[in-house]
Structure formats: C-alpha cells, structure tokens
UniProtKB/Swiss-Prot annotation:
Reversibly transfers an adenylyl group from ATP to 4'-phosphopantetheine, yielding dephospho-CoA (dPCoA) and pyrophosphate. The lineage of its organism: Bacteria, Bacillati, Cyanobacteriota, Cyanophyceae, Oscillatoriophycideae. The gene is coaD. Substrate binds at residues 8, 40, 72, 86. It comes from Microcystis aeruginosa (strain NIES-843 / IAM M-2473). Its main location: cytoplasm. This is Phosphopantetheine adenylyltransferase.
Length: 157
C-alpha cells in the first residue's frame, strides 16, 4: 500500500523525519509530498525542500520525495495511494486533522487518513517554531537535521 505524507515542510524538522521513519515499515511506499502553495511566502523553494528531505531520507529505500499543488486527494489518486499520513502533536492538531480527513473522504471515498502520534520529544515542534527561533538568532540544531540547520543559518545571515 502507498501512503502520501503531504506538507509544506518549510523547513523539514526532526519531528517530520520521525513520522517518515516510523511510517516506513507500515507501507510498501511512502511519498513525502511537498506542497506548492502560491498563497504562502516560503523560507525555501520547493526544489530546496525536496533536496533537503531527499538528503535526510536517502537511507530509506521505500521513501520517495515529490511535489504537488492542488487537492491532496487528487494527487493521492494520481499516485495510486489510498492513505494520507498525518502526524499529531497535540489535541488541537487532532481536531483540525479529523475535520480534514472527513473533508477528504467527501472528495474521494477511496482515501483513508492514518494518524501517527508524534514522539513525545517532538510534541512542541513545528516549522513555524523553528523559523521564529532562527529569525531571532537562536539555535535550531536540536530541532532540524544538520543540512537544514546550515541552510537556515545561511538564509538568516
């Protein structure tokens, strides 16, 4: 079975990688799908985010990195995936993600959403938190992969 793990991943965090690595044994293939959202002003280009994630997941043989725009369920259908993978940190994530799962189901009956609870050490972590810390000169080396922290420091220098 193929699973899609969609997100902006701007930047990819250790929490994202935790979800990816824990999903690998559960599915034949995991596609990490980087969203191209024209309404957001990203820190990194889609191409750079794909490069960052590819570097971090190169040891995972059944992980593929791609990008998409538009509806996630349409992308999943195009890729032959029946599962959307989502990480949950806190209760408010669950409320938002459950609503989205129900919405996606109305768009395509063939899609299921699988939730993975974030490992406790990453329960506070988000890309927004990383960007805010970095913007004010704080260290993010314990929050993102090494290659990503270098890119972040380069961006803010």
């Amino acid at each position: 079975m193929i699973a899609i793990y969609p997100g902006s991943f701007d930047p990819v965090t250790l929490g994202h990688l935790d979800i990816i690595e824990r999903s690998v044994p559960l599915f034949e293939r995991v596609i990490v799908a980087v969203l191209c959202n024209p309404h957001k002003n990203p820190l990194f280009t889609v191409e750079k985010r794909i490069e960052q994630i590819s570097y971090c997941t190169k040891h995972l043989k059944n992980v593929e990195i791609d990008s998409f725009s538009g509806l996630t369920v349409e992308y999943a259908r195009l890729k032959g995936a029946k599962v959307l993978l989502r990480g949950l940190r806190v209760l408010s994530d669950f409320e938002k993600e459950l609503q989205m799962a129900h919405t996606n189901k109305t768009l395509w009956e063939g899609i299921e959403t699988v939730f993975l609870a974030t490992t406790k050490e990453y329960s506070f972590l988000s890309s927004s938190v990383v960007k805010e810390i970095a913007q004010f000169g704080g260290s993010v080396t314990h929050l993102v992969p090494e290659n990503v922290s270098r890119d972040i420091y380069s961006y803010y220098s």
